Amino acid sequence: MDILFYHPTFDTTWWINALREALPEAKVREWKCGDHDPADYALVWHPPVEMLAGRTLKAVFALGAGVDSILSKLQAHPEMLAPSVPLFRLEDTGMGEQMQEYAVSQVLHWFRRFDDYQALKNESRWEPLPEYRKEDFSIGIMGAGVLGSKVAESLKVWGFPLRCWSRSRKSWPGVESFAGKEELGAFLRKTRVLINLLPNTPETVGIINLHLLNQLQDNAYLLNLARGVHVVEDDLLIALNNGKLKGAMLDVFSREPLPAESPLWKHPRVAMTPHVAAVTRPAEAVAYISKTINRLEKGEPVTGQVDRIRGY
């Protein structure tokens, strides 16, 4: 069994050694330009077209939860990967726990009005504020995949009203489910905190625009943990400046790194992190990949395969 590995920033030596230990029967090598030797599996992140084109592979693993970079290249270069080759994403590998930590900490930050108290501190004002009530702090999660379910599970224990919106209806205990475009408005109207965990597909690009934001409750909050292209940033600024949105926490942006001239940097009600909400944990990723490859080799059922048409 031959395995190709490519990642532009990871510690390649660590990964190759870990994969060799987890799959002792495999020959693992780093892909380099000009390598056209046969391989059975490819483990990649933002792979060059040349790496995959023309290969007869059993499967390709994206080294992250999203596969949009591969799918976008496939649109421009369909010869890069035959339709018959299964494409897998990392289902969790520790990212769910990280998303839970991020979402819970930010929701509680807003609920306890720490953003307001920081603003008062900046003005040297000692002013206790009325507390929010949980029943008035409904949380809506857009995207009901593995990460969405993890976030909902972690927030449920705090007693907030929870709702989710996705392509198909879910049956999560304690979470009100909305499905399809026809139910999006009803989902938004009672949402105070909007958490975006949607996949990156042609249908979801630009979905968080002024029309959508205006349907939220007044003084709403936005937490974007998915992709920057989901948010129309100019519309977000309008909603913040006219008071519809009280605050936004952004981990992802339409352009990364975020340009220095972006008004988001200096907006007083925007907080941000540099795309670190959930990162690949190498040891857990190797365990998932090796387990999946072993099951594929035995012809056993596996999870994590991407539907190329849906984009996730």
Curated annotation (Swiss-Prot):
Q: What catalytic activity is recorded?
A: glycolate + NADP(+) = glyoxylate + NADPH + H(+); (R)-glycerate + NAD(+) = 3-hydroxypyruvate + NADH + H(+); (R)-glycerate + NADP(+) = 3-hydroxypyruvate + NADPH + H(+)
UniProt xrefs under Gene3D superfamilies: NAD(P)-binding Rossmann-like Domain (3.40.50.720)
Q: Where in the cell is it found?
A: Cytoplasm
**Protein's name according to its UniProt entry:** Glyoxylate/hydroxypyruvate reductase A
Keywords (alphabetical) are: Cytoplasm, NAD, NADP, Oxidoreductase
Instruction: Please name the PANTHER family in this protein's record.
Output: 2-HACID_DH_C DOMAIN-CONTAINING PROTEIN, D-ISOMER SPECIFIC 2-HYDROXYACID DEHYDROGENASE NAD-BINDING DOMAIN-CONTAINING PROTEIN
Q: Which domain of life is it from?
A: Bacteria
Asked if NADP is a keyword of the record, the answer is yes
Q: Which family, according to UniProt?
A: Belongs to the D-isomer specific 2-hydroxyacid dehydrogenase family. GhrA subfamily.
Asked if the keyword Lipid metabolism belongs to this entry, the reply reads no
Q: GO molecular function: any one?
A: glyoxylate reductase (NADPH) activity
Q: One Gene Ontology cellular component annotation?
A: cytosol
Q: What residues make up the catalytic site?
A: 227, 275
| InterPro entries, per database record | D-isomer_DH_CS, D-isomer_DH_NAD-bd, GhrA_Enterobacterales, NAD(P)-bd_dom_sf
| Pfam families according to UniProt | 2-Hacid_dh_C (PF02826)
Name the SUPFAM superfamilies on file.
NAD(P)-binding Rossmann-fold domains
What does this gene product do?
Answer: Catalyzes the NADPH-dependent reduction of glyoxylate and hydroxypyruvate into glycolate and glycerate, respectively.
